[in-house]
Amino acid sequence: MRVSDARPLMGVAWTITVYAGDRHAGDAAIAAGFAEARRLEQVLSDYDADSELSRLSAAAPTPQPVPVGDDLWRLLVRAEEIRGLTDGAFDITVGPLTTLWRQSRRSGKLPRPDKLAAARAAVGGDALRLDPKLRGVSLRRPGMRLDPGGIGMGYAADRVLAVLAALGIDSAMVDASGDVVVSAPPPGTAGWRIAVAGLPGDDAPDAKTLVLSQAAVTTSGDARQAVDIDGRRYSHIVDPRTGIGVSGPAAVTVIAADGATADALATAASVLGPDAAADVIDGVPGCSARFVWQAGDGIEHCTTAGWPAD
C-alpha cells in the first residue's frame, strides 16, 4: 500500500512516500522518518544557535579537537572527501562567505572588499582538521562558520531512508525539497519517477522524468535563488576559492549512490562548470550529471557519459 505525507522541516518541505503492508505500518514508518529528520536538524542546522554544528562553529578557533557525535562526524568526513575530489570547489568551511553574500542579496550591493577579505581568511581546507582517533574536530581560524547547506539535506535524507529500511520498508522515497533519495522500486515498476529540474524553456529530450532505484538525485543552481547587482547575476552558491557568488543562470542535476554525494557534487558542479565538473563526476562510481545554462536568448545543455539514455 502506498502511503505518503509531507511536513516542513529544516526550512523546506519534506515528503516521505513508502510502500507498506497497510496504512498503519506506513504511517508509523513515515512518522519515524520525520522524527529522524527533526533529530538531525538539531545536529546539523546552521540557523539554530543550539545545534551541535552551530555550537562547534561558535567555538572557533578551537585550541584542541572538539569531540562530536556520529552524525556530525560522518557529515564532516564526507564533506572533506568531496572537498578533495573537487579541489576545493565544495568546502564546508564556506560559511563566512555565504553569510556575507546573503547580506548582499538582501541589500542589493556587493560585499565590501575588506569584509570579503576577512571572510575569505576564515575559509579553506586547511582551516578544518579532523582527528579520527578522537572523532574530534579542530577549527583553526577565528571567525570560522561551517555551512552544511551543500551536503546536509542530502545526508539527512540518507539517514531517514536508513530508518525506513530498518523498519522493514523496502520501497521508499524521501524528497527533501529536491534532494531525493530512493530505495527499491514501487511494486511492479522499474523505479521511482523523478522529474528533472532545469531552467525555463529547457525542453531538450534529456530534460525528462528519471526512473531510479537505490539512488539519489539533486539539482543545484541559481534558477530561483540569485540576485542582480550592478548588471550582473550572482547565485546563492559561492565559490569557496574566490569568495564570489557563481554567475549564471545555470542548473546541474547529479545522480549518485547516496544523497550526501549527490548534494555536494551538485554544489561543486555549479562552481566548476560543465567541463571541469564532468571530469570529477566521471571519476565517481554511480555518478552522472546533466548541465543546463542560459546562452544568449537560448538554452544550452550537456550530460556526462553515464546520464540515463532517452
Predicted features by range, described:
Residues 1-310:
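Mature catalytic core of soluble alpha/beta enzymes
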